[in-house]
Amino acid sequence: GVGDLIRKAVSVIKNIV
């Protein structure tokens, strides 16, 4: 769902930072 996409996006952002 949308929540899963948001969590995945947050994980990717944390990996980049």
Swiss-Prot record:
The protein's name: Uperin-3.5
A single Gene Ontology CC term: other organism cell membrane
Keyword Protease included in the entry's annotation: no
InterPro entries: Antimicrobial_8
Keyword list, A-Z: Amidation, Amphibian defense peptide, Antibiotic, Antimicrobial, Membrane, Secreted, Target cell membrane, Target membrane
Listed result of changing G1L: Loss of amyloid fibril formation but no effect on membrane disruption activity against bacterial mimetic membranes (DMPC:DMPG). Displays a significant increase in amyloid fibril formation
Organism per entry: Uperoleia mjobergii (Mjoberg's toadlet)
Positions marked as site (Involved in inter-helical interactions along the fibril): R7
Temperature optimum or stability note: Thermostable. Retains antibacterial activity against M.luteus after heat treatment at 60 degrees Celsius for 10 minutes.
Main function: Shows antibacterial activity against B.cereus, L.lactis, L.innocua, M.luteus, S.aureus, P.multoci, S.hominis, S.epidermidis and S.uberis. Strong activity against M.luteus (MIC=2 uM) compared to S.hominis, S.epidermidis and S.aureus. Acts by inducing permeabilization of bacterial membranes. Forms amyloid fibrils which, in the presence of bacteria, aggregate on the bacterial membrane leading to severe membrane damage and cell death.
